[in-house]
Amino acid sequence: MSGSQTLVVKLGTSVLTGGSRRLNRAHIVELVRQCAQQHAKGHRIVIVTSGAIAAGREHLGYPELPATIASKQLLAAVGQSRLIQLWEQLFSIYGIHIGQMLLTRADLEDRERFLNARDTMNALLDNRIVPVINENDAVATAEIKVGDNDNLSALAAILAGADKLLLLTDQAGLYTADPRNNPQAELIREVHGIDDALRGIAGDSVSGLGTGGMATKLQAADVACRAGIDVVIAAGSQVGVIADVIEGTPVGTRFHALETPLENRKRWIFGAPPAGEITVDDGAVTAIMERGSSLLPKGIRSVVGNFSRGEVIRIRNLSGRDLAHGVSRYNSDALRMLAGHHSQQISEILGYEYGPVAVHRDDMIVS
């Protein structure tokens, strides 16, 4: 239909449980009703849902389990099926089919798998099926987790080619301070560009009971806005919130998309969870930030993590501040050997070479 929009709706644990130990089914029913209403108008809806662990814990009668990754994965394995059944039952009331997509970081940091996931998403949406997305917590370890569903929702929005991303939480939006501790805190209505001051505000506030606080929501907003996607942070309890976002009615905090969004490949580079990170010296910082240069091995001071050639990595300065994301031309072991050396020495050190740069400027997105 003309004017149809694609909206990604992310529902965190605090929204799905209402702050309790169990899923708040009445509230979920209302959110599904709102989604179905917009679906009937021709809009394309994508759900990013938390709650698998909470659903598993509830279904098993709140067992006493050790605080281990295995326990969380056990609960997720039990709860994931319960959660998807709930979404299926509720959407079926409105004659809407859903399709489950379980993702891990590996599905998103590899370009080919990213494109495959995008094709699946588009196939579902083209057939009027609502994708329901969650991280695959039953198998994901720290090494392969995206880490939180806020950032996962930004990546889902990129996959879906979304117009808007709605992050539902237990607060009305982003405030100038934590409203639970500071009665003078004011709601920030509009954001045009995310800066260090805003990051400082978000870093001091938390949201709900899940893994994502306001800081991760700001990270997600940054990724999505750079991809040309408007983002709204709003309360899940706000009456008619989904219709408000679709219609452009002011609600919560709105982050305006960049007027000149990143092209598709660079959206993937910026959005993909980094497989590792490198720290660079001041000379490299100047070359990257002021001259728009590629990163040479000479400027590398340290390498963290194990990654392959062609994976996305984070580039940081000596103070630990993020400078850029980029696709590494060499694997982590090779970069450790090359760190601090001139490009002319690459072949001598490694016995092979893939060119003189560690990360080419064309494969780099400055933060």
Swiss-Prot record:
GO biological process assignments: L-proline biosynthetic process
Q: Where is it located?
A: Cytoplasm
Query: Under what name is this protein listed?
Result: Glutamate 5-kinase
Key words, A-Z = Amino-acid biosynthesis, ATP-binding, Cytoplasm, Kinase, Nucleotide-binding, Proline biosynthesis, Transferase
Give the pathway: Amino-acid biosynthesis; L-proline biosynthesis; L-glutamate 5-semialdehyde from L-glutamate: step 1/2
Q: Which family does it belong to?
A: Belongs to the glutamate 5-kinase family.
Q: EC number(s) for this protein? A: 2.7.2.11
Functional note: Catalyzes the transfer of a phosphate group to glutamate to form L-glutamate 5-phosphate.
Name the residues that bind ATP.
K10, T169, D170, T211, G212, G213, M214, A215, T216, K217
From what superkingdom does this record's organism come?
Bacteria
Which intervals hold domain PUA?
275-353
Broad enzyme group: transferase
What would you give as a GO molecular function for this chain, any one?
A: glutamate 5-kinase activity
Xref: PANTHER family: GLUTAMATE 5-KINASE, ISOPENTENYL PHOSPHATE KINASE
